[in-house]
């Protein structure tokens, strides 16, 4: 489930990121993976992920580690407007990632960018990986683009399939 506001709120979210401040009214992506894979939690329990974009570095120089609980509370407070049953009573534990912890766990995720590229509007959606190259072809003949840095972005597993379809389409067009 995605919780997004108006266009103006989304623009403000990205403006906050660009200026190095934690978004005041963040948009949220959520997933309850145990609905599809119950093995991810004990019987009768579920897992829930809340995700959003934040600046990799805070303008005031603070580490995200020192702000993560406050920011996670802000996300959960907003999420509760749509899922009021998410009370402290039924949250048994939490794990909060930060840009720093993500990069520590996997140095390839520079600045904690799990979706590849920067978390800016200019590198989102059809602008991935960069404007003009969202159709999985590079300017080099027979060199195709795929992966988290391509449209639609990391966390969505379609990029490999779409790239393969483009390659097959090109190969079919070359047949006599």
Give each language-model segment a name:
Residues 45, 67-75, 114-176:
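C-terminal structured subdomain/cap of oxidoreductase catalytic cores
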Residues 42-74:
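Conserved FAD/dinucleotide-binding core of flavoprotein oxidoreductases
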Residues 23-31, 81, 85-151:
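A glycine-rich dinucleotide-binding beta-alpha-beta segment and adjacent secondary-structure elements
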Residues 7-9, 33-37, 55, 119-121, ...:
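Short, glycine-/Ser/Thr-/acidic-enriched flexible segments
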Residues 31, 37, 41-50, 137, ...:
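Redox-cofactor-proximal catalytic regions of oxidoreductases
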Residues 2-9, 22, 63, 67, ...:
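Catalytic cores of large soluble enzymes that bind and process phosphate-bearing ligands
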Residues 1-40:
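Mid-domain catalytic core of redox enzymes
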